[in-house]
Swiss-Prot record:
It comes from Chlamydia abortus (strain DSM 27085 / S26/3). This is Nucleoside diphosphate kinase. The keyword Transferase applies. It catalyses: a 2'-deoxyribonucleoside 5'-diphosphate + ATP = a 2'-deoxyribonucleoside 5'-triphosphate + ADP; a ribonucleoside 5'-diphosphate + ATP = a ribonucleoside 5'-triphosphate + ADP. It is found in: Cytoplasm.
Length: 141
């Protein structure tokens, strides 16, 4: 059973789409192993997105991620990383397949509703960034 990190970004939290997005994950067969709402500090956002530090969009991304609360979740399921990315849709909501989260709730490449880990290795790093082992409820399977 794989785990992946999902973040419901400030735009979706602010527009009260949390429940709808969680329902999409659950109806897609994911189990939520951990979840919390928090307001990222500048330091937390910069640390989480440190891999993008040299990219031109870095500061805009940090500013957006600290603009309001986020919901951080550990999703668990078969092939979780790839399936989550499929359910989220393309980074650019205009290119996302109909029915995906970003097609439904995203506005632009920068304001695109959700974040999801892009690999198993990064999922482990990202999960550990936000959650301690005792906060994650593993399935009995």
């Amino acid at each position: 059973m794989e785990q992946t990190l999902s973040i419901i970004k400030p735009d979706s939290v602010g527009k009260a789409h949390i429940g709808e997005i969680i329902a999409i994950f659950e109806k897609s067969g994911f189990r939520i192993a951990a979840m919390k709402m928090l307001h990222l500090s500048v330091k937390e956002a910069e640390g989480f997105y440190a891999v993008h530090k040299s990219r031109p969009f870095f500061q805009e991304l940090v500013d957006f991620m600290i603009s309001g609360p986020v919901v951080v979740m550990v999703l668990e399921g078969n092939n979780a990383v790839a399936r989550n990315r499929e359910i989220m849709g393309a980074t650019n909501p205009q290119e996302a397949a109909p029915g995906t989260i970003r097609a439904q709730f995203g506005e632009s490449i920068g304001i695109n509703a959700v974040h999801g880990s892009d690999s198993l290795e990064n999922a482990a790093i990202e999960i550990n960034y936000f959650f301690s082992k005792v906060e994650i409820v593993n399935s009995a399977a």
